[in-house]
Every structure is written in C-alpha cells, then in structure tokens.
A protein has these predicted regions:
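The feature primarily captures lumenal catalytic ectodomains
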Residues: 1-171
C-alpha cells in the first residue's frame, strides 16, 4: 500500500489522499477509450468469488432477496473477477448505479463519473473507506449499515441482513 504512515494499512486506507486517487486514475486510464455501451449502467457486485477466508466472514444473509429486488429494477449481477482490469475501469466509468457489499471492489469507484449513484451494504463497523473514496470522486454515495448477525472481532466482518424496504427506498 503506497500510503501507510502508521504501520496500520487498515487505518491508512480509510482516507486516501486525493493525489493518490488522481494518480491512479490518470495512469490506468491513459490509453483507454472509456465510453463503451457494452457495459451495464446498473449493476450489483456479487462477491461470491471472494476468497473463502473473506466470504465466510462477510456475507449478505438474504442475498437472494437483494438480487431479486435489484433484478426487478434492471440491475445486472456481476462478478468483478470476470472482468480484466481495463474492463473493470470501463464498467465503473459507464455505470449510473452500483450496489454491493462492502469490499475491495468499490476501489474501482475512482474511475466512475460524478453522476454515479453508489449504494454500499455493510456491517456497521466496517469503516468509511468506500464512503470517503466515493466523496473524493464526487460520486453520490449512500449506504445501508446493519448490525451483523454473526459478528467477528475484525470490525469489517459479519453477516448482515438487508431490510428490503430500506433497499427499495434507496434504489
């Protein structure tokens, strides 16, 4: 990680400097044609492909309900591992609405346009990394923060249940 000043990467990434965000955006988009209508404008980030040590510790208990609700609103379910880095950049650049469980996939928000609406679903102790990044990228950020049903001492973890009315009101 390029910005660890206190020997604690988890703490350091909560608020990345704008210069790092700008540098990443510039370097990784330099020779890309970003406009591409082949990518969905609304999608849900499915973390079913997350490493087993993470996926067993942080899940949406009622994910099938969440996916059903989002599908009715024309959200496509995607796994970021199905896309190259270049295509992930294009995916986020062309997105209008993104919903997903708190996780590293939201780092791609730095490549989004400012009209993106991002909804993060997260355990209540997960921190503000995604929120801070979204705000620095001028993205419209919202979250549903839920007390975990199954809690792990690492505050980013825990299985959460999303209230369908809360989800409906925010999409």
């Amino acid at each position: 990680h390029p910005y660890v000043t206190n020997n604690n990467a988890t703490s350091a990434i909560q608020n990345l400097p704008q210069s790092i965000i700008d540098w990443m955006r510039q370097k990784l988009t330099k020779n890309l044609n970003l406009n591409d209508s082949n990518f969905p404008s609304k999608f849900y980030i499915d973390r079913g492909d997350a490493s087993p040590n993470i996926s067993k510790l942080r899940q949406i208990v009622n994910e099938n309900e969440v996916i059903d609700k989002l599908s009715k609103h024309k959200f496509k379910v995607i796994k970021l591992s199905d896309y190259s880095i270049k295509d992930q950049i294009k995916l986020f650049f062309n997105a209008k609405k993104i919903v997903g469980l708190h996780g590293a996939g939201f780092a791609n928000v730095m490549f989004s346009n400012t009209d993106l609406k991002m909804l993060e679903l997260k355990p209540s102790g997960a921190g503000k990394m995604c929120e801070n990044l979204a705000k620095k990228c001028n993205v419209i950020y919202d979250c549903i923060s839920v007390l975990p049903e199954k809690f792990n001492e690492n505050n980013q973890m825990g299985h959460i249940r999303i209230n369908m009315k809360d989800l409906q009101d925010r999409i």
